[in-house]
Amino acid sequence: MKKILVAVDSFKGSMTSIEAGESIEKGIKIVLPDSQVRVRPVADGGEGTTEAIIYGRKNVNAEKCTVTGPLGERLTVSYITYDADEGKTAVMEMSAAAGLPLVPEEQRDPMHTTTYGVGEMIKDAVSKECERFIIGIGGSATNDGGIGMLQALGFSCLDADGRDVPYGAEGLGVLERIISPYKPERGGNTVEFFSVGDSGMHSGDDVDVALKLSYCTFLIACDVTNPLVGELGCSRVFAPQKGADAETVELMDVYMKHYADVVERSVEGKSDRYTPGSGAAGGLGYAFLMFLGGKLTPGIDIVLSETGLETDVEWADTVITGEGRIDAQTMMGKTPSGVARLAKKHGKYVIAIGGCLGDGAEKCIKEGVFNECYAVNNVLGID
């Protein structure tokens, strides 16, 4: 009896991961009615990550809280928590609080959108005793270097007159000092290089949260390799997609360099502005690296580990994976290549299904990523 594992990413704009998987299962059952089929949703750290983990783990709790949206509006967001060997874990997507779809097209302006709500989500999870965080940082509407998140977590981001800087990339331009409400106990990329703020600068709640944060770990699902600044930095590459015109893009890159200067002049021998992924989500990756000891990791690797998909791969004879488009980019850390890599580790036959096959799909076959590639109107790898 044929045993088939279906683990496909969402077909964006058409089907979620689970919907696509169940559709494939129906087709398999028509052709191979006696086969055993397991459908497992997967994702690469962006849209659908929490859904994939919910399916892959037991005793997952749904959490909700009210946070500040990218335009300063109040909105309700969801995330999940569960107990893991490494400690109580929170899984959240930054796009829930600061995603581009939350901003009407005519109001998109990364000079003013904020990640404050991301910090509020983290703060809520800390209050619920979470100590391990998995955070997807794709799909952002922001370019604020993560200072909104820091402000929500109790950091003082101040201008030359000691006033809080405004939301958004605009705040980076006038930033002169960042004060932490605590000195962390753990090592790594933390904020221990900042002195504790002046008395009265932070509320007791902020200090309590910050002290708990110093013992938290952050695994950041990040699939872009862009640095914080420069030609390939977040401002020049991603800000136009978020509503910035050419003049604003150049100004934001200047502001981002100033932000990095403010941070790094306080750190002897430490700089993450050119670290791959530091420019993710408008510089949010940089904030996680420099202030919270975050580890940037390919999202699919996190999902595969957290969901225990390897057990299902070992069970199967054939593994079917896929996403909306199979092309040269598929091999660069995207969901199908991650699933295929795990399947090949166990000697499984791998079939990829895409909504379409783009340039470079043939390379996925030639380099042995997949045994076959299917799309609606094209097939590769079949004699």
Residue spans for each PLM region:
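N-terminal loops that bind phosphate or other acidic moieties
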Residues: 2-137, 141-383
